[in-house]
Regions:
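Helicase-core coupling region on the C-terminal RecA-like lobe
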Residues: 1-80, 144-145
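A short beta-strand-to-loop transition that corresponds to the Sensor-1 phosphate-sensing loop
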Residues: 2-4, 114-115, 152
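A short acidic (Asp/Glu
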Residues: 9-12, 116-123, 146
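Structural motif
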Residues: 49, 111, 150-152
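Conserved helicase motor "Helicase C" RecA-like lobe of SF1/SF2 P-loop NTPases
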Residues: 80-138
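Conserved RecA-like P-loop NTPase helicase motor core
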Residues: 132-152
């Protein structure tokens, strides 16, 4: 089964655990664009895993959860993404993902499982240059594609 959306490193876990090694990474240059980037902890692995300790909370009038620490970290990542993608220090960014190829915020998506978290992130980004980023739940993202994701 050919996958054209993700880098082979990202496909490895689901391929091993769920697809019996039937997935084949066939992405274009965009799936390899971050390889070698100085913003990655491992420049050969185009994903950042970031554990964020925090407390799941709820508003009194809502059953949906949110985590303030996650909201603040997502905001920081989004602002850094805009800062770097907009040209300031973008030398460290791969050419394919500099502003001329990555439209910040239009090509960036933030995915979270909780509607309460969606609302908090949207509010946190509302006064920033990243206010146009699509922030949605997993269900809302089904079948949509962005060049870069910030999942929670």
């Amino acid at each position: 089964m050919k996958n054209f959306r993700s880098h082979a490193s990202i496909l490895q876990y689901p391929n091993d655990c769920f697809y019996k090694n039937d997935l084949e990474a066939c992405g274009n240059q965009h799936t390899n664009a971050f390889i070698g980037s100085t913003i990655l902890p491992n420049p050969n692995y185009p994903i950042i895993f970031h554990a964020i300790p925090g407390l799941d909370q709820r508003e009194a009038n809502s059953p949906s959860f949110f985590n303030v620490d996650e909201v603040l970290q997502v905001k920081a990542y989004a602002e850094e993404l805009h800062r770097l993608g907009a040209g300031e220090n973008c030398v460290s960014w791969p050419k394919a993902l500099r502003l001329n190829d990555l439209t910040v915020p239009d090509d960036v998506g933030i995915i979270t499982p909780y509607h309460g978290q969606v609302l908090k992130i949207r509010k946190a980004l509302a006064t920033t240059a990243m206010s146009g980023v699509k922030v949605a739940s997993v269900e809302e993202y089904q079948g949509q594609v962005w060049k870069m994701y910030i999942p929670l």
